[in-house]
Amino acid sequence: QQDYTGAHFDF
């Protein structure tokens, strides 16, 4: 999962 919201990196 790639949630590039600001500085959110959830792989």
UniProtKB/Swiss-Prot annotation:
Q: Which GO terms describe its biological process?
A: defense response; regulation of blood pressure
**Alphabetic keyword roster:** Amidation, Amphibian defense peptide, Hypotensive agent, Pyrrolidone carboxylic acid, Secreted, Sulfation
Q: Where is the signal peptide?
A: none
Q: In which tissues is it expressed?
A: Expressed by the skin dorsal glands.
The modified positions for Pyrrolidone carboxylic acid read 1
Q: Which residues carry this modification: Phenylalanine amide?
A: 11
Per the record, residues carrying Sulfotyrosine are 4
Record's subcellular location: Secreted
Q: What is its main location?
A: secreted
Could you state what the record's PTM comment says about this protein? Isoform 2.2Y4 differs from isoform 2.2 in not being sulfated.
What would be one Gene Ontology cellular-component term for the protein? Answer: extracellular region
Q: What does the sequence similarity comment in the record state about its family?
A: Belongs to the gastrin/cholecystokinin family.
Q: What does this protein do?
A: Hypotensive neuropeptide.
Name of this protein: Caerulein-2.2/2.2Y4
Q: Upper lineage ranks? A: Eukaryota, Metazoa, Chordata, Craniata, Vertebrata
